[in-house]
Amino acid sequence: MKLKIFMLAFFTGFVFVFSAAAIFVYRYSATDKKAPAEAESSSPEIYAESETLLLIFEEDGAAGPFTLVCFDPQNGRIPVLTFPAAAVFESLPDMPAAAKVYKELSHSEFAAATEKELGIAVSGWFIWNRNTCETVMAKAGSFDYILPESLFYSDGERYIDLSAGVQSITGKKFYDLVTYPDFDEISRCDVTSRLISSFFGRRVRRFLPEGSALSSSVYSSTENSVDAFSRAELRGAVKALCAEKTPISSHVTCDLDEGKDGELYFSAVTRERIKKYFTAEKNE
């Protein structure tokens, strides 16, 4: 009798312990399976969409060049492309040059025309000038840039003397390079794009702190279309971009085809580059 009672108690206890262990394993296995999803949902910046800005150089009534900067978290890069005021917008009636389109439209309408012409989405536009160069660089600090050749200019009003080799770029030097009088439009676009690419490659992390002095200097020294909501989205893209490793900032060459009367058209190669670097697709 005692043996039967002992066996019954032992069997009952075994079933209880086994059931408890099974429930424990099931519950914690389910938790483990859900962990990645929960981790993903708690880090929305990983999935931040790319943000493309249109930077418009404007001073003394003249505009251009025009620069596209894309903050692309999915591919970990910041491509920069600059096109001249003479570039033709083939998607518009009479195919006007960018300078004419800009003159006849509002800033936001020009951004929309750029979207249509190049097949991209522009998140916001910024108007920058000499004051922007000096104000932003005063907060960002100078950065090194390799100048391939010496540049000299003097006309009684302006004096520019930059030696070939490594230059420490200040606000004045930034402005002098972008507006160097003896550059043709293609050379000006190339230098502008490389300067802006170098700037973001070296200084993008300084935009990360909430209300950073660098961000404030950009917004205060420019006319722009970026409201509080857009600023939050832009900051989210930059935060995601810098989350794991230093993003690659690169100059994207803007090749132009010359028409019979000297018009400059975006080449097929350039349009392919824009499609590759300024759209939201992830490159495997």
What role is predicted for each listed range?
Residues 2-81, 269, 278:
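Entry/capping segment at the start of metal-dependent catalytic domains
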Residues 46-49, 60-62, 103-108, 126-130, ...:
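Solvent-exposed, acidic/flexible segments
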Residues 54-62, 75, 79, 84-96, ...:
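C-terminal solvent-exposed extensions
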Residues 57, 114-122, 129, 140-144, ...:
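Sec/Tat-exported extracytoplasmic proteins
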Residues 65, 107-115, 119, 130-134, ...:
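Extracytoplasmic/secreted envelope proteins and their assembly/folding machinery
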Residues 79-105, 149-164:
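Flexible, solvent-exposed short loops/turns enriched in glycine
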Residues 104-161:
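Amphipathic, coiled-coil-like alpha-helical scaffolding segments used for oligomerization/assembly
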Residues 138-214:
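Flexible, polar/acidic helix-loop-strand segments at domain edges
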